[in-house]
């Protein structure tokens, strides 16, 4: 619309406008039949040169797919997050309300369906009006605007700032090129294709492009659902998306909307009654904004940490570009659909179990995280923690499940158990001793004694003497596991842990020290869950997988992910370990039970001063690791503490994490699943209890009572 000004044009402006008027007249006379304004005097020279300049321009514009947001989806197809630099969702013509098309044509180019890309009448009127009142009235058709926006978009996508600027520079050359491109484009595209392309590429806000994204931003519904009043508001934005932004400048937006409504009434698109109702409706009453941030910050608190993990895998994958920068640009412009392994039912249950035990911002200051991996595939099905994702005070972007490094405590003992079984030892062999002091030479690697400092095993009262491996595992007897470690290849325990993915903070094999047998080493819940998933699936360790398939904007597959697994322990040993872990939990984990008596294998872990507590375990369907501690102060004692309103003198892996987090969660997620037992495999001959010596009051055939 023309913005009239009271002042007159200065002489220099007047001459420029006169020259432009005659130059344009000559151009149109050459190009458009029926329009001819003679050129006289020196201006005629300009007019005669126009066709020559025009003929030297490229005849076709390369219309490319514009930047479009990418979607990260869960396993059920729900949107986890959107990624973009420009918020745009490209939609076909039939997904845009007809009244929206009518509104944009009415206000931007009412002769759109009559001209061939350039509107001579509109250009002449604009020149005359500008000449008469010193203002500046545009004369670009929708086709010309589409050309201009397309060139800008191509420059943006190709990182060519000069090309992007060339689309808007105030030169005759640019205008000539735009006109020729528009005329050519009208020969290769239908009016509906041009209009749809324009509505998908035009700006509707500071970073919002295309009518679909605009409709979702301002009204929280699709462009197909736009009504006439909403269409008028959006149609008015394209002239100046920042100045007329209804979220920041509602008064200006309302004035502009009313102008569009007037034109729509004059064109017969709406009635007089509609017009009166429309202009009397405050813009604020129309808006239902959806200003969800892009990226994982826009994901819900439940899914944000998995989002962080999944996008990290995407950005590390060279299938999407040979540099991090290219992969990130593809993510934010390529209109990708990234499908993931996240099971929303499991993830919701994980979050609920965590916050039921330790609420967000609990007075204890404790953090907790849990992750579930599918045995046999490595698919990460759930990843949650009791914190809010973000950069504000009280929030964190640190992913404790994937990136947290916390001492694992007795959970590490499972690798001693595996090495014990790998070397052919029986589950019923006697392990442990009363003397808890181990001196130099009692541990060996490759058959050769190794040097270690004298080590005095600390243990809870009542854990002296000998046990079999089932009871030693269930009761988590430190001295028994140190004894087992002294009777196998000591270094291979740590090599085996590394094979399962459990290393030190630098990715190196954990140092072969007696203290590390008991869990001084650190790891993440994801790594521990994945290691136990390998035990649950015949010793097959799979790479943790967050992505399943990535497709481009046309749904062509860029990459489909398949399980990447390798054998790290023999199936026999894995089954034996599963059997022992199942027997030990069934016998000794009285606080941790699954509904219906469903069998599971697990190992708890508690570090010095109860600073970190764990329960990591599995069924044939799911492997889950849960951790409790303080992420920012992982050595700080967790004793004499109130958690969720309840006092604890100390907490432990089995009685706190297992009872309050792991078991409730695993019971919930197994509802409706098949009841599958753990492997029934030979783990050694059950020793015959020695017959006690008969006494006068005890028959010789009385059996010895078990524990």
Predicted regions located by residue number:
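N-terminal type II signal-anchor transmembrane helix
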Residues: 1-71
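Extracytoplasmic/periplasmic proteins that interact with beta-lactams or build/remodel peptidoglycan
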Residues: 41-42, 59-69, 74, 137-145, ...
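Peptidoglycan glycan-strand catalytic modules in the bacterial/periplasmic cell-wall system
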Residues: 66-271, 327, 388, 474-478, ...
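Acidic helix-start/capping segments at beta-turn-to-alpha-helix junctions
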Residues: 98, 117-133, 144, 276-299, ...
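Bacterial peptidoglycan biogenesis and beta-lactam-recognition machinery
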Residues: 106-119, 132-138, 185-191, 203-208, ...
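Conserved catalytic neighborhood of penicillin-recognizing serine enzymes
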Residues: 132-156, 291-300, 425-493, 553-583
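Active-site loop and adjoining helix of the penicillin-binding protein/serine DD-peptidase-beta-lactamase fold
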Residues: 178, 182, 186, 238-256, ...
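A penicillin-recognizing enzyme superfamily signal
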Residues: 336, 340-362, 370-372, 383-385, ...
